[in-house]
Every structure is written in structure tokens, then in C-alpha cells.
Amino acid sequence: MALLIAWVCVAVSIEKALGGQGDGGDLYSENITRILDKLLDGYDNRLRPGFGGAVTEVKTDIYVTSFGPVSDVEMEYTMDVFFRQTWTDERLKFGGPTEILRLNNLMVSKIWTPDTFFRNGKKSIAHNMTTPNKLFRIMQNGTILYTMRLTINADCPMRLVNFPMDGHACPLKFGSYAYPKSEIIYTWKKGPLHSVEVPQESSSLLQYDLIGQTVSSETIKSNTGEYVIMTVYFHLQRKMGYFMIQIYTPCIMTVILSQVSFWINKESVPARTVFGITTVLTMTTLSISARHSLPKVSYATAMDWFIAVCFAFVFSALIEFAAVNYFTNLQTQRAMRKAARAAALAAALSAATVPAEDEIVSHSDSNCNLKKRVNSVTSQADQSPEASIVSNSASQCQPVSAPPPAPPAPPPVGGTSKIDQYSRILFPVAFAGFNLVYWVVYLSKDTMEFFEPTAMHLRNDHQSN
């Protein structure tokens, strides 16, 4: 019996406890509802906190969930962020069983919020899937935390003088649209070093390295007052790998190929012509393709200078062959004219020696006839040694012929031109020297660009708004 009574008492206690918890939960919800109703009773969301009195301070910080891509052609970048704002509204102080009221986005439209806008933003999107991505909390002392998830497409002015060894500081500027400095000021909630967070996994870019970010604040003046502008600079350094593979290496190889023609025989005109024209066309194609990924700027970039010098080397190699061919033909023509003059002179000399030869032949014939007559007179006499000598002399009398003229010397052919010999040394040395100077200058240079718009630009923007 006693055991039964004990079990009944335990059951009653458990039932009371469960009933008390349910009543307590309902009571808690009712208390929160009363607190919210009391906070909104007489609340005017058209007036900022401290209207007509103290300045409203809005503390901000940014958490970047995704950075990129960066467009060089459009000079803009895109990022996905959690944009947090914190301020104090004395009208929303409360007391009760909880220290923080964690509310959804429906409460946002019922209270005052800062009119923050991004000054250099081209397009900003507030995410609404599956519900508006907004976080709203109210602390007992009236401090409000308001967080939004945004995708921001912002302008990033770039000066591409050092492209592709360039670096850029892409700004993100924001501030109040309508409230001047006398009513709203912005500050960094966690200080200048930790107010903007960019995790390593959020900054994986194809053509850039995000090397860091800095923050600053400034005050600009306009006809409607002074406004506080908060700025975040994202420091981007361009990666060289793509351009080394697609532009620089082909240009260097094309220049080297153009210099191979210096080692080809100067008489091989078709081969050297093909080398020259092919390399010039290749450089033209490379220069056109290099500009496809760039905006149409009016100044020359570092890559433009490199391509221009490579094009000059290739074109100079073609001009060098034209000079070699010209001087070779000129030398050949001179040799042929010299040979022709020598042949004409030899022919003239040959013609001048013909009468003398005829005279010699006639004298020889007369002597021979005289000797024949002498021999015939003495033929009847007794033969003496002297007669036999005269007879032998007569038998040896023959016509004398002049030697033929020497043929003209042929024009010189073959050999290596002195221009080719000098070019084999000067062209490679000059190109190697250019590369040494080019890479030392640009790789050791601080190419990070900063763009600071003037107050006049900001003033005109605000007046247009």
C-alpha cells in the first residue's frame, strides 16, 4: 500500500512539473510579445535615433564569403559579403528575461535603419532565397545588429601601364545616402585591421592574387553638407603564368626563329624570304591576340612595349636579308660589268695584233721563196755542207700564229656576307640585353596602383543624386 502511494506521489509531481514548464514557455512568449509591442508603441521609424540631438554612430564590418571574378575589360570586380551594421537606438531599450531579442527580417521594416549605399557599386543584389538573408538582433541597452548578405559588383579603376606585371587596389566605398556628417558617422567596429575579413578559401582567383586589404575613412564636402565615406581597398597582384605561356614565350621564340635566317646561305633567297615573312605574320597575330583581354586604352602597356620591340627585331631581320640580297646583286653586277669590260679589252687587243701577224707571215713566205730559189740554183752544183745547211733552213720555214686571248674571269659567287656575319652576333646580343633590362626593371618595380578620386568627382556624383 505504501509503495502504491509513493508511485502516485511521483506521478503527480511529474505532471505538475511538466505543466509548469508549459505554462512557463507560454509565459515567456507572452513576455517577449509584450516587450516588442511596447518597443513599437509610439515608435516612428522615419526618425533616426537621437533625432535633433546626438550624432548616430554606425559601426560596420565586412565578412567576404567569395571574391571575384575581376574583369579587366570592364574594370570591375564582384564579391559576395556579409555586410554588418551596428548602432544604438535608445528607444529600443528593454528589460526582461532575455538579453538579446533574435528576430527575423519582418522586424527590419518596422524600425529605423541606416540608408547605407555603395558609392562605386555598379550593381548590388540582396539575396532573398529562400527567405531574405537578413539577421536582426536587439540588445537590452538598445544596441542593434543588422546583417545582410549582398553580392556587390563594384567599379575598380585600373591603370594598365605595367600590365601584366601590374597590381591594383580595388576600392569599395560606402556611406550614408542622405544623412550628412552632422547626423550620421560611420566607424570600423573591430578597428582598421580586423573589420574586413577575407578567408583564404574565399579569394581563389584565376588571374590575380589577393595579397591583402586595407581600410580608411574620409570626409567629403558637397553643397548639401559633409559626408563620411568608408573605403576598403582590396590589393590585387596579377599572375604572370598565363601571359608567359601565351604571349611572352611565343614572342621570344619567334624572334629567335627570325635570327636563324642569318645562318642560311645568302643565295637561298626563297628560304630566307619564307623565314622573314612567316615571323612577321606570327608577330602580327600575337600582337592582335594580346589585346583581346584588355580594354581599349590610349596608352602603351608593358606588354605592348615588349611586343613592339620583338616586332622590330623580326622586321629588322627581314630588312637585313633585303640588304644582303641587294648588296650581293650589286656586287655580282659589278663583277659582271668588270668581266665584260675585260672581255671587250681582250677582243680589241686581239684585233690590233692581226696586221702584225700578217706582216710576219709575209716576211716568212718571202724568205722561204728566196731560199727555195737559192736551193734551185745550187741544186746542179756539188753539194757542200753549207748548201745542206741552207736546205735544212728552208725546210724548217713555217708560218707563225698568235696565241689566243685569255677568257674573262667569272663573277664571284657563294660565300658569307659581312652583314650576316655581324648580324649573327649583334642581333642575339641586343635582344638578350633588352630582355635583361626589361625583366629587371619591371620585376623589381613596385607596380601596385592606387586610385584616389578627388573630392570634386564625389561632389558631382552626390549632386547628381
UniProtKB/Swiss-Prot annotation:
Gene3D superfamilies: Neurotransmitter-gated ion-channel ligand-binding domain (2.70.170.10), Neurotransmitter-gated ion-channel transmembrane domain (1.20.58.390). CDD domains: LGIC_ECD_GABAAR_A6 (cd19039), LGIC_TM_GABAAR_alpha (cd19052). Residues 265-270, 326-424 are cytoplasmic. It is found in: Postsynaptic cell membrane; Cell membrane. One of its GO terms (cellular component) is postsynaptic specialization membrane. Its main location: membrane. 4-aminobutanoate binds at R84, T147. It holds the Pfam family Neur_chan_memb. Residues 401-413 have a biased composition (Pro residues). GO terms for molecular function: GABA-A receptor activity; GABA-gated chloride ion channel activity. It is a multi-pass membrane protein. GABAARs subunits share a common topological structure: a peptide sequence made up of a long extracellular N-terminal, four transmembrane domains, intracellular or cytoplasmic domain located between the third and the fourth transmembrane domains. Alpha subunit of the heteropentameric ligand-gated chloride channel gated by gamma-aminobutyric acid (GABA), a major inhibitory neurotransmitter in the brain. GABA-gated chloride channels, also named GABA(A) receptors (GABAAR), consist of five subunits arranged around a central pore and contain GABA active binding site(s) located at the alpha and beta subunit interface(s). When activated by GABA, GABAARs selectively allow the flow of chloride anions across the cell membrane down their electrochemical gradient. This is Gamma-aminobutyric acid receptor subunit alpha-6. The gene is GABRA6.
